[in-house]
Design a protein with these regions (language model features):
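Gly/Ser/Thr-enriched, mixed-charge loops and adjacent short helices
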Residues: 28-35, 39, 151-278
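Short acidic, glycine/serine/threonine-rich loops at helix termini
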Residues: 97-102, 127-131, 149-155, 239-244, ...
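N-terminal small/polar loop signature for handling phosphorylated ligands or for N-terminal nucleophile
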Residues: 87-150, 246, 251-306
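Conserved phosphate/anionic-ligand binding catalytic regions in large, soluble enzymes, centered on
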Residues: 35-55, 143-146, 232-240, 244, ...
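Phosphate-binding and adjacent anionic-ligand microenvironments
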Residues: 287, 291-293, 333-527, 534-536, ...
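An N-terminal, well-structured beta->alpha segment
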Residues: 4-103, 196-228, 236
């Protein structure tokens, strides 16, 4: 019962006083929400609201996660894990720095060394550092682009990739073995330093990482006669992102108000480059300086948003559109230079547009689809190392891209450099913007349009309704929708596909999602978010014109939402 857990916290003599105050200010309903069950690992690790309780992120739940990780590393690697150590980074959020040090204190109690970044750093740099330092694992304290009252905890394997379920599930089971959050052993910072269990890292890793990022350039000597507005949205790319662009010769105008590491993200409604509102200050500056390109990264610098000048205003590209532009640029330019491999591979996910895959296949390359979550792409990049195939590009619709595998997660710094280069190249050689180039791509491969509907459903009742909706689409699959017959149904939880009445097995890991593909090539996916209390509905269509594709997109969306609304 949640009340028993609540009383345990209230009667705990060592409970942090601020957290105790937090509990005293809660209503009974609020207390039930924060004690009904523990935080769980999702597609992006653990994310939760800051505060007291087992369903909130605080020093005790952070200790619990690290205790499980420490025991997992010692069980699977033995004492070598102590020498390899764990790399730890954090973002600009409230309690991030404290949680990062708290992680080192728990690991140190098990004799495991920590390499702790001296200040906030981009998540992709954590992936790089874990690989470079040959560490046993990596940790980053971040909630990505979630609201300011959230924080999070992500763990990476020795290859710099987020743990996939077969390993993460073992870690989670070991985390859940912790029954008393107040008895977890820690050691002080002073003891960590005295016993050489804590090493601070920073500038030397920055330089190595940035040199690798610069290696992705295809036409580094292209004339850079474009103006770029850059905003880190108060996050971790402020220093490295600006330095990267300026050191490679671009004229950059940073949004100064958003270069500040503000944990409240006070200048934006949401620090998410997927949202148009996040670009408001960048657009204002862009109009002032007549910029050609606007670039925004999310707070932990793994996602990239791009906006392109059109007339007197700016058009925001979707993640799918940016991905298509980047893959087209990589393949066309490397083909000109004769640097394309014979057996190149491109990765995307089950909710990503078909456009990038069509481009890759037109160049004769294999396209491998993964489940949602960049950890699956990172895992696949590693698998290629023992084959004669070469990684070309990986991306997903949610504004995540990776060009080279020295990082095994999405990397906004790689993406912003290549997007800037593509914009400069097309401007100089074809007198075209990225938006005009996208229209060229549409002419060749067809117009592709996508949409994402987020349905927020909070708390215990919300979680139940999300499950009920997905189950309705799973247990009783539709045979048609929006006057289109269903041609393919895929269930990723029970790992099967039905096409033309024939049932075949899917080889993906299991995840709670279903996909429908219609006779006209349109498709949609329903899945609960792995990091937030919401149901996600992804839709993709193709058409001869942008207008006809958007009409189809809206029509399918309305039909799905009408069905969802009937499920209580």
């Amino acid at each position: 019962m949640w009340k028993d857990e609540y009383l345990r916290w209230m009667n705990e003599p060592t409970l942090d006083l601020e957290l105790k105050k937090d509990l005293l200010n809660k209503t009974e309903k609020e207390l039930e929400e924060i004690f009904y069950g523990p935080l769980t690992f999702g597609t992006g690790g653990i994310r939760g609201i800051l505060g007291a309780g087992i369903n909130r992120l605080n020093i005790y739940t952070i200790r619990k996660a690290n205790d499980g990780l420490a025991r997992y590393l010692l069980k699977t690697k033995g004492d070598i894990a102590k020498l390899q150590g764990v790399v730890i980074a954090h973002d600009n959020r409230r309690m991030s720095k404290e949680f990062a040090l708290e992680s080192a204190k728990v690991l140190g109690a098990y004799g495991i060394k920590s390499f702790l970044f001296e200040d906030l750093r981009p998540t992709p740099e954590l992936s790089f550092a874990t690989r470079y330092l040959k560490a046993a694992a990596g940790i980053v304290i971040t909630a990505s682009h979630n609201p300011p009252n959230y924080n999070g905890y992500k763990i990476y394997d020795e290859f710099g990739c987020q743990f996939t379920p077969q390993f993460a599930d073992v870690i989670v089971s070991m985390v859940n073995e912790v029954t008393d959050l107040f008895q977890i052993k820690t050691v002080s910072k002073e003891v960590l330093i005295e016993k050489h269990l804590l090493t601070y890292i920073g500038q030397e890793i920055d330089e190595l990482y940035l040199n690798e990022v610069k290696s992705i350039q295809i036409n580094p000597q292209v004339k850079k006669d474009i103006k770029i507005v850059f905003t880190p949205l108060h996050g971790t790319s402020a220093e490295l992102g600006l330095s990267l662009l300026e050191s490679t010769g671009y004229l950059v105008y940073p949004v100064l108000e958003q270069m500040v590491h503000d944990s409240s993200f006070s200048t934006v409604k949401s620090p998410n480059p997927e949202n148009a509102s996040a670009f408001e200050m960048a657009i204002a500056l862009g109009k002032k300086v007549d910029a050609d390109l606007l670039i925004a990264t999310d707070p932990d610098a793994d996602r990239l948003g791009v906006a392109v000048k059109q007339g007197n205003d700016y058009v925001l590209l979707t993640g799918n559109q940016t991905g298509a532009i980047l893959i087209n640029y990589i393949l066309s330019e490397r083909k000109k230079q004769g640097t394309l491999p014979e057996n190149g591979v491109v990765f995307n996910t089950i909710v990503t547009s078909d456009l990038g895959a069509k481009i890759a296949r037109a160049y004769g390359f294999n396209v491998i689809q993964t489940l949602t979550g960049f950890k699956y792409i990172g895992e696949q990049i590693r698998y290629l190392e023992n084959t004669n195939q070469e990684f070309i590009f990986g991306y997903e619709e949610s504004y995540g891209y990776v060009i080279k595998g020295f990082v095994r997660d999405k990397d906004s710094l790689q993406a912003l450099l290549l997007a800037s280069e593509a914009a400069a190249y097309y401007q100089h050689y074809e007198n075209k913007t990225l938006l005009e180039k996208l229209n060229d791509i549409y002419e060749t491969y067809g117009v592709h349009q996508e949409a994402l509907h987020n349905i927020d459903l909070f708390g215990i009742e919300g979680a139940k309704r999300i499950q009920a909706i997905v189950e309705r689409f799973r247990v009783n699959p539709l045979t048609s929708i929006n006057h289109q017959n269903v041609m393919v149904f895929e269930d990723y939880l029970y790992s099967y596909r039905i096409e033309k009445g024939y049932k075949t097995a899917l080889s993906f890991d299991k995840t709670n999602a279903v996909k429908y593909i219609l006779e006209n090539g349109s498709w949609f996916v329903l899945r609960p978010s792995g990091t937030e209390p919401k149901l996600k509905i992804y839709i993709g269509v193709t058409g001869k014109t942008v207008e006809s594709a958007r009409i189809e997109l809206d029509s399918i969306g309305q039909a799905i939402l009408a069905l969802v609304d009937q499920i209580k």
